Amino acid sequence: MGSGPRGALSLLLLLLAPPSRPAAGCPAPCSCAGTLVDCGRRGLTWASLPTAFPVDTTELVLTGNNLTALPPGLLDALPALRTAHLGANPWRCDCRLVPLRAWLAGRPERAPYRDLRCVAPPALRGRLLPYLAEDELRAACAPGPLCWGALAAQLALLGLGLLHALLLVLLLCRLRRLRARARARAAARLSLTDPLVAERAGTDES
């Protein structure tokens, strides 16, 4: 008779036990089933996309959102990931897509990603993302604050180099003038001493 309550208690504990993946491991507003994370058609953008997914994710669905790019390292942080559904997003093919392009290049099969086409910029519109060269993506990126900062630093160094070169030229000119003056003074002194030497030589001979 005692096994009845114990069996009911065991069944209750089994029903109340947490699933194989804790609810906290599934980022909002996605839904999770086992190692599949479905974030498709939820209007996600760069700003609203979850910053991390469960590390054991094997399949990730991001189809049908408003994603123009993915944060760097987002997919690389999922070592068990086998498939990422990325279609039906307005991808902007510039330097922000370099990490995604590198991740796609490392996939053994590119067939699932042949529908990833660039929506912008105009020069790359309609191109297939997996087959773009990295240089094409970087060239499509407008210079940002870091680029302008690097350019300003290079211009400052160039200006300092030109200033040093100008100072060196002025210093060399100054040295040449000083040498010329010294030679002129030496020649003048020599011209003054030559008659005296000749006169002394004449008196000595007499």
UniProtKB/Swiss-Prot annotation:
Keyword Transmembrane: yes
Residue ranges of every copy of the LRRCT domain listed in the record: 89-143
Assigned keywords, A-Z: Bernard Soulier syndrome, Blood coagulation, Cell adhesion, Disease variant, Disulfide bond, Glycoprotein, Hemostasis, Leucine-rich repeat, Membrane, Phosphoprotein, Signal, Transmembrane, Transmembrane helix
Expression across tissues: Expressed in heart and brain.
Record GO cellular component, one term: glycoprotein Ib-IX-V complex
Domain of life, source organism: Eukaryota
Domain LRRNT: 27-55
Mapped LRR repeat ranges: 60-83
Membrane topology: Single-pass type I membrane protein
Residues annotated with Phosphoserine modification: S191
Modified residues (Phosphothreonine): T193
Carbohydrate-modified residues: N66
Record topological domains on the Cytoplasmic side: 173-206
One BP annotation, GO: megakaryocyte development
Molecular-function GO term, any one: identical protein binding
Main location: membrane
Membrane-spanning residues: 148-172
First and last residue of the signal peptide: 1-25
Disulfide bridge map: C26-C32, C30-C39, C93-C118, C95-C141
Disease named in the record: Bernard-Soulier syndrome: A coagulation disorder characterized by a prolonged bleeding time, unusually large platelets, thrombocytopenia, and impaired prothrombin consumption.
Extra remark beyond the main annotation: Platelet activation apparently involves disruption of the macromolecular complex of GP-Ib with the platelet glycoprotein IX (GP-IX) and dissociation of GP-Ib from the actin-binding protein.
Quaternary context: Two GP-Ib beta are disulfide-linked to one GP-Ib alpha. GP-IX is complexed with the GP-Ib heterodimer via a non covalent linkage. Interacts with TRAF4.
Function: Gp-Ib, a surface membrane protein of platelets, participates in the formation of platelet plugs by binding to von Willebrand factor, which is already bound to the subendothelium.
Protein name, entry field: Platelet glycoprotein Ib beta chain
